[in-house]
């Protein structure tokens, strides 16, 4: 028995390496499958056969590198613009801000401005204009952050648990207004001083000219004539300089005044929201308890997504009623009803803040002298000494740079005021990045509080219907249809009612693009460069269908545009080999823009410079490529049995309700209708291209 076991073990040891050694995946990249006759073709021999199947004669797809090797003379190819690669141009920006950090930075900057720690650098230094521009840009960023907070989070701030958030936002607006007003005061004072300086110096120039003209001796007059010319030149230079300074200051003044107006509107809007909270507390003291009752009625909802949360829709309904009944003036109620009547219930969270802001803009503004008096009051914001203030600037600067050992770096900055000033400017420049919320935008669902569950268990459904008026039964027919549709949407979206929860995560465009880069070894769906075809220099662009279907995105369009520009400057013939599914839908309108851009460059190349452009259409060439540069060539060449179309067969049949034959979009059929200038087999393509170029260049 022992001998038999040993023999089995030895057989297993001997056979295992052989079985593991043969793995078809290891050799897959060396072979190509002909889809027409299902014959495996060795890739090295495929290139020797010019990409044509030896068994059935079908024209097979080739990569861009293989086509370049097929068309260009050995050793003459030189790639250009190889480092261009796609980015996610439609990526949604992270717009969740840490408002506590925003408040911290805004208070810090107000301390600096009001304390006049860097007054010389901001308002007296010869480079003050740069500092003021950064200050104005900071205020614009602050307003935009508040727009995000008071726009997309409008309904959230109407909840009873938003008091702290509203207080933080009020602090931000308050310090922002004070900073803007202080800067406006200094800018306007500087404008006044510039006008005064201009009047004095202009008078001085005039006095110099008069004294020169009053010279009695002829020789003195001749000497003074050159002096007069010099004075006039200096006077003109001074006027130009003053004009540029005033133009810059007036522009900054206008921008800051606009920022101040927006901050005032946001301040009044926030006060309206705070008033709403007070009214809700007075008229609905048990609001929190009632919301738990509503959650018991609708247990089907898994999270708090505002797009599909019926509870939020219900609260919106209630908030609108509250604002109409209790918020502020009768004029506001009448105005609000007229503005709101055209909106659907689900659209109000999107447009509600715009309506309110439009309303408060019509109200009286703060008077400037009241604002200045308010600024001059000594408050908590101005009570920090310079050492503590500089330390806060240093900490924020190193927080921006993700540096942990900022305490060690503090000493070098406290002794150098210029260093602290530099840190402050960097903080203002990177304000939006510094205040981004580092938390996940959509955090995982938190566990329910035990207190909430205890309260809910003690509630009777009959009591709910009696106490809370907005139940399902009290809704109108249209509202019930809306709720039912949302319930089905929620169940289908979150796979509710099924045994297991299936998580589906969509791959981002950036990851999708990176996967193709790793698979093909190309930065994007085209290779461009310069080479020789039978000794003739040409500019060549070859699209690669293996990379995301050869789709035309921003990078493909840019590389083709730069290739055309290069060919125009160097008077080279241009050849574009097309193999594309059309515009890249992941980039939206950015991909469609490439069609116009390329067509405009081709117009200059062909019409103004009278140069030769040849397009070679291979299978498949569809969509935006067919509609743009694919059909704009002086000579259009197509390969046999190639699929050439604008819209696909299925799209045409669904749109026109007509049956489309498979042959109707094949190059052999289209060539009979004169759609192309020539149909050339791949084996003859190189010679045909060189002969066409020779005829065009030396035909006369």
UniProtKB/Swiss-Prot annotation:
GO terms of molecular function: acetyl-CoA carboxylase activity; ATP binding; carboxyl- or carbamoyltransferase activity; zinc ion binding
This entry's Enzyme Commission designation comes to: 2.1.3.15
This protein's pathway reads: Lipid metabolism; malonyl-CoA biosynthesis; malonyl-CoA from acetyl-CoA: step 1/1
**GO cellular component terms, A-Z:** acetyl-CoA carboxylase complex; chloroplast stroma
State whether keyword Lipid biosynthesis applies: yes
Q: Keywords on this record?
A: ATP-binding, Chloroplast, Fatty acid biosynthesis, Fatty acid metabolism, Lipid biosynthesis, Lipid metabolism, Metal-binding, Nucleotide-binding, Plastid, Transferase, Zinc, Zinc-finger
Protein residues bound to Zn(2+): 34, 37, 53, 56
Cofactor dependency:
Zn(2+)
Q: Which InterPro entries match?
A: AcCoA_carboxyl_beta (IPR034733), Acetyl_CoA_COase_Trfase_b_su (IPR000438), ClpP/crotonase-like_dom_sf (IPR029045), COA_CT_N (IPR011762)
Q: Where in the cell is it found?
A: Plastid, Chloroplast stroma
Keyword Zinc attributed: yes
The record's comment on cofactor binding reads:
Binds 1 zinc ion per subunit.
What Gene3D superfamilies does its record include? 2-enoyl-CoA Hydratase, Chain A, domain 1 (3.90.226.10)
Q: Name one GO biological process term.
A: malonyl-CoA biosynthetic process
Tell me the disulfide pairings in this chain.
Answer: none
Name the job this protein performs. Component of the acetyl coenzyme A carboxylase (ACC) complex. Biotin carboxylase (BC) catalyzes the carboxylation of biotin on its carrier protein (BCCP) and then the CO(2) group is transferred by the transcarboxylase to acetyl-CoA to form malonyl-CoA.
* Subunit structure, as described in the record: Acetyl-CoA carboxylase is a heterohexamer composed of biotin carboxyl carrier protein, biotin carboxylase and 2 subunits each of ACCase subunit alpha and ACCase plastid-coded subunit beta (accD).
Annotated family: Belongs to the AccD/PCCB family.
Q: What is this protein called?
A: Acetyl-coenzyme A carboxylase carboxyl transferase subunit beta, chloroplastic
- What gene is this protein translated from? accD
